[in-house]
From Swiss-Prot:
One of its GO terms (cellular component) is cytosol. A motif ('HIGH' region) lies at residues 49-59. This is Leucine--tRNA ligase. One of its GO terms (molecular function) is ATP binding. It catalyses: tRNA(Leu) + L-leucine + ATP = L-leucyl-tRNA(Leu) + AMP + diphosphate. CDD domains: Anticodon_Ia_Leu_BEm (cd07958), LeuRS_core (cd00812). PROSITE patterns: AA_TRNA_LIGASE_I. Disulfide bonds: none annotated.
Amino acid sequence: MSDTGTKRRIERFDPAIEPKWREFWEREGIFKAGRRAGAPRRYILEMFPYPSGDLHIGHLKNYVIGDALTRYYVIRGYDVLHPFGWDAFGLPAENAAIKYGRHPREWTYGNIAESKKSLEIAGIMYDWSREVTTCDPDYYRWNQWLFLLLYRKGLAYRAKATVNWDPVDQTVLANEQVDAEGRSWRSGAKVEKRELEQWFFRITAYAERLLNDLDKLDKWPENVKTMQRNWIGRSEGAEVTFLALPPGADLHAPPPPDAEPLVVFTTRPDTLWGATFMVLAPEHPLVSKLTAPERRAEVEAYIARARMESEIERTSATREKTGVFLGSYAINPVNDERIPIWIADYVLMGYGAGAIMAVPAHDERDFAFARQFGLPVRVVVQPPGETLDGATMTEAWPGDGVMVNSGPINGLPVGKGEGQSVKATIAWLEANGKGKGTVTYRLRDWLISRQRYWGTPIPMLHLPDGTIKPVPEDQLPVVLPEVQDYLPKGKSPLAAAESWVNTIDPETGQPARRDTDTMDTFVDSSWYFLRFCDARNDREIFSREAAHRWMPVDQYIGGVEHAILHLLYARFITKVLYDEGLVPDDEPFRALFTQGMVQRRVRTPLEVVAPGMVRFPEELRRKLELPADAQSLDQARALLKERGYTLEEESNGGFTAVSGPVTMSKSAGNGIPVGPFVRQYGSDVARIVVLFAAPPENSMEWTDEGVAGAQRFLNRIVALFSPDREEIVAALNSGNGAAPEGEERALYRKLHETIRKVTLDTEQFRFNTAIAALMELLNEASRYRSEAGRVTPVFAQTAATFARLLSPFAPHLAEELHSWCGGTGSVYDTGWPEWDEAALALDEVEIVLQVNGKLRGRIMAPANADEQQLREWALTNPRVLSFVGDKTVRKVVVVPGKLVNVVV
């Protein structure tokens, strides 16, 4: 498109230009993947959202970053895949639908339409032909296919387990969905423990690969990789089997036939000789069998209390230790000693096998427990230069030293190396058949069952004889039925859909019941990036050819809050599919960028009740615990200051309470809807504010001043180039290729400095400094145009190049400027400008003059001046001569282009 026919003096940026360019991009398929077949490819992806309805400006940052990168690579000639979709199943959609009294499907698709409209008006360009929605049967069919693949490989299984139960959402949660305080990631409710039959994905089978392959991800933030390493939690040690004696067993006799093996994992097997009691997690499956009858009531009461506590509470180092003796004993395999078995809440089923050998002399938690209940403390490590006595110790000694009271390893130094205690103990255990060296992980298998309606049905059948078998692949998808009552009840609402639940096994003709749980919504997002490669394939999850064309994702963009959940699951599923030969790489995301948040201050008007007196509104009062009665301005100011707020006087005489910067959200009341803002100010203004305010990995504050600054920048572009559009076109068409001279040389150099700066900064996500460089170029071009008094070829070249450099950041105005310069078609088909190294060479450089290494002056010299010229200029410089005086010059050191040092 070109708009050079008439000369109009447009002095300000007009947002009304934007719709025509969005329509043009869509019509011409400028951002459609495959448009440049054979070109180098780029796959850029932002994490897809829950469809929450009309987007606010805070949502845009993630998408603007991805869009800027996409536009940069499109104009550079790449074939770019930049798709979009909707993470539409799961608790967020279902809970919102319940809250507003609408069916989840109606609520979800209505919000998708609103959200899509917001993205389109914001000028975020996606290849919408590849759009996916996870609640569509043609998407979740492949969730079910994936489940069956994992089931065939032994990676999906059903087991009874102690699970995390959300009492508000009435469903099970994976460990990763419970925060450090033991609360649900969605509802915030205190999580309870329940015993339930559930479906799991065996992610632990990939623990070692998930851990080791983090080292390959050199374009991921270190903090994200550290979080994953800590969550996987690799520990080296030994598995040792104790024998648990039944209650009432003779402690002096050989173990009876019904003695139970009790497997313990320890990272310090060398301290086995110091174990004086055992502790089981309250949830351990042997607790009931090992409990003496007279202790059963006390034990069961303790277990009930432990189930109400979070893991963080149970493992707190400062909390007083609690526990109950079961009334039974275990045999320590290294010395045949009978030691008492307790339960205590500081031991978790999630660590090792839910059982520990307690060595109170050398573990602080065990020491506190032993002192609390009067249990013996036996020293097996003596620190250098000290002699510890278990009876008088005031704290555990977990450090280095020499082994004592430890049979075959007495005298060895503590450590894991050759000839040290840990390695020697493992060798002794293995040689004597009492244990083995092993590795364990904190990571637990992924619990995917959910007792909620709005999710992917699990494609399994339950037969009358108790057999559980998969639905045949040709019967997929198992479609989620329409139900009217989908409120959470503690079991899946699907269980009440009798006509759906009761079915026939297609292979045997027997009656069967469908599984009524649905899948965790994180299954949906664990592979969606692969579906984008081949989104309309109705024969397979995606073709190998499409996956090999596009995968892995070159740049993934999203919040750091997904470091453990989504990103870990996506890596796991990708490795499974890699092992099946379906994808070309076993890591899904080559590079990861985690953006900061958009923040805005919350402004709350106060009620003026009398001159100098105000009253806080009720909502603010409740939120900040403020008094209800009227306050003087000084009192109000002091109360607000204590809570991180300020009091501002408005121009109309009113007063407003202003918070500090708060993440923009609907709940905080500080969101700015995308649609109204873009219609008033323009998408390009919003984009410049978001990209210029701060480095994109940092949080940024959205302010009126930032909006005004972005407007000024775009207005200045229009004011500088629009009035000269005809002259610019004529100058560009003149074919004058002469090298710039004089004043033109300075603008030409600045132009190429800017090309280099914007190129390098854009590729490094330094969008704010790239835009700052464009502002500097605009200043230089404006000064040059004013002094030249006319349009010259170098000014015209600057205008045309400016359009291309601006295109990732303010794309609508970039297209408009491109058309003013006589461009036809899209600016994105013109190619990215290359900088000229010769143009960057300076005509003159500053030379530092020194005498005996001390600064004595500066001169400007031609950049190509040789050593002899620089030497002569230095030795005749009046300031240098004044410091040399009548002394003899012994040596002159010349560093061309930098300095001359006269040594006397």
